[in-house]
Amino acid sequence: MAILPIRIVGDPVLHEPTETVSESPAELSELIADMYDTMDAANGVGLAANQVGIPLRLFVYDCPDVDETGKPFRRRGCVVNPVLETSERPETMPDPDDDVEGCLSVPGEQFPTGRAEWAKVTGTDADGNAVEIEGRDFFARMLQHEVGHLDGFLYVDMLVGRNARAAKKTIKRAGWGVPGLSWVPGTVEDPFGHDD
């Protein structure tokens, strides 16, 4: 298995809708394993195929959640050809503390992002079996974030007001927003500080 370079905002593969997956589970197995390795090395909670330069409609996740009693646990899996359904997205400004979101393709940065409280994704898993996953709060945020990647946009594309202006300045200051930039987890310091 391999850790793959993660494309940075501005790379064309991140800004175009991905292609429907027609490959068999066997043909996808190495890519999916590499995506898990890459996500784990980056301490991510989700990773879309186009973030590693592959314009296919699939993502992997390893995301914290809470059960109905409030007990924390992790949900890990893969969804191929996901279809997203959500509750209504709030029209108010996102909370600067509760709605902060980050992205491995905008390394080290976080901005308040408005998301629906509930989301459900249907598709198939890594073995080709039908799958339906749903969640609330942070897990719902992750589902919306990853499907957004597959639809050709990043979370910074949906920011509003001062958050959009701040993201634009940050991207410009970092020299991002151009094709060909990437980073390889494990070869540089964790941009989100998980190495500390």
Swiss-Prot record:
Principal EC category: hydrolase
EC number(s) given by UniProt: 3.5.1.88
GO molecular-function terms, A-Z: metal ion binding; peptide deformylase activity
Amino-acid biosynthesis found in the keyword field: no
Residues reported in the UniProt entry to bind Fe cation: C103, H145, H149
Record-annotated active site: E146
SUPFAM superfamilies attached to this UniProt entry: Peptide deformylase (SSF56420)
Keywords in alphabetical order: Hydrolase, Iron, Metal-binding, Protein biosynthesis
GO biological process: co-translational protein modification; translation
Annotated cofactor note: Binds 1 Fe(2+) ion.
Necessary cofactors: Fe(2+)
InterPro entries: Peptide_deformylase, Peptide_deformylase_sf
Protein name in the entry: Peptide deformylase
UniProt organism field: Rhodococcus opacus (strain B4)
Classification lineage: Bacteria, Bacillati, Actinomycetota, Actinomycetes, Mycobacteriales
